[in-house]
Amino acid sequence: MTPLYSNYGKDRLFYFRMAMVAIGAVTIFRLFYISMLPLTSDEAYFWVCSRHPALSYYDTPPMVPWLIAAASGMLGNTEFAVRLLSPVFMALSAILIFFLSREVSGGGDKPAFFSAFMLLSIPGYAFAGLLSGVESPLIFFYTLSLYLIYMAVQRKKDFYWIAAGLATGLGFLSKYLILFI
């Protein structure tokens, strides 16, 4: 099958590098900016929950408090530690979108670059990368699940189905809504 779009030579590396530079620049900006914002009430709630680890909470799954507990354990109880993993998850989601778009387009890095760039420019996505909440791990695990399901269908290997189930399960620990998406 002929790819829908193919790259040759320097073009392929150019668009890959540009995507990684754009994702890196946005992530560095987010990491700098999150240290200047005060915590929101939801973030403070997740921070309190992180100090009392449990398998579930009254109104939220446990992933975000667990992640905050891990970051706080490494960096101390700071506002930066509470928010640290949101920009990281959003950067990983953009990288996954790049690779998923590359697969879907038949190996083209140009459409993959534009897909990742468009994702970075969505206002809701940009906002979710600044605040600690259920959205950033949900988006990451959902995107990972989509990528793995696509790979399972294309490559016909059971490993991808198992990994997609694991990613969906981790997404379920982030927000129960993932089962309906």
Which residues does each PLM region occupy?
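Start-transfer (signal-anchor) and selected internal transmembrane alpha helices
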Residues: 1-29
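Transmembrane-helix signature of polytopic, membrane-embedded enzymes
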Residues: 16, 97-121, 140
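Short helix- or helix-capping micro-motifs
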Residues: 23, 112-123, 168, 172
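Extracytoplasmic catalytic/substrate-binding loops of multi-pass membrane glycan-assembly enzymes
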Residues: 35-46, 56-68, 76-80
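Loop-to-helix entry region of an early transmembrane alpha helix in multi-pass inner-membrane enzymes
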Residues: 62-66, 76-95, 128-132
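Membrane-interface transmembrane helices that cradle and orient dolichyl/undecaprenyl
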Residues: 102-106, 145-160
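Short acidic/glycine- and proline-prone juxtamembrane loop motifs at membrane-interface regions
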Residues: 124-138
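Transmembrane-embedded, aromatic-rich helix segments that form part
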Residues: 162-168, 177-181
